[in-house]
């Protein structure tokens, strides 16, 4: 079984870097819209997998729990409210549910496609860790790993390099997967502008 985890902050804290251009209510609506897009991409990808898959939203926010229920996916309560700790706990629960593979997708990937998610899984045939970096090649927008795995989650500053370094130190085969749609996230006002321009009808 494949477990797909989509971590999402509490809405009140999400997308704080966009506070200068979006009001709190607008940021919350954006987060929910992005999360729904990522859920849809993950769900569409499961049809191409060679084994069953389950999708979990990892969050402390009751609104995200409601989104999970409305979307027909599962919710893992985030009791840590720190991304790496939350994903470590999620990995335990996903592995206990019988998963042999875990895919982590950031919840703010407005362009991610089902093909991207499937590519993460397919790339594991020749690796123990597959990592999709952001546009700067520093952050981690998505990753896939075989379970069980000793790899620590190292999301945060320069996480792409730190994940690869940790995998190498553990003797794990790491592979980078770079696509424009996986690399694009909404972490600043310029990318928000680009996203809105692309969404605007011609």
From Swiss-Prot:
Which InterPro entries does the entry mention? CofC (IPR002835), Nucleotide-diphossugar_trans (IPR029044)
What phylogenetic lineage does the species belong to?
A: Bacteria, Bacillati, Chloroflexota, Chloroflexia, Chloroflexales
Which sites bind phosphoenolpyruvate? 140, 156, 159
According to its UniProt entry, one GO biological process term is:
F420-0 metabolic process
Q: What else is known?
A: The exact nature of the substrate is currently not known. This entry has been annotated based on its similarity to Actinobacteria.
The name on file for this protein is Phosphoenolpyruvate guanylyltransferase
Whether Transferase counts among this entry's keywords is yes
What this chain does, per the record? Guanylyltransferase that catalyzes the activation of phosphoenolpyruvate (PEP) as enolpyruvoyl-2-diphospho-5'-guanosine, via the condensation of PEP with GTP. It is involved in the biosynthesis of coenzyme F420, a hydride carrier cofactor.
Q: Which GO terms describe its molecular function?
A: GTP binding; phospholactate guanylyltransferase activity
According to its UniProt record, which protein family does this protein belong to? Belongs to the CofC family.
Q: What is its EC number?
A: 2.7.7.105
Question: Which biological pathway?
Answer: Cofactor biosynthesis; coenzyme F420 biosynthesis
The scientific name of the source species is Chloroflexus aggregans (strain MD-66 / DSM 9485)
Reaction(s) catalysed (UniProt annotation): phosphoenolpyruvate + GTP + H(+) = enolpyruvoyl-2-diphospho-5'-guanosine + diphosphate
* Keywords of this entry: GTP-binding, Nucleotide-binding, Nucleotidyltransferase, Transferase
Task: Read off the Pfam families from this record.
Answer: CofC
Enzymatic class: transferase
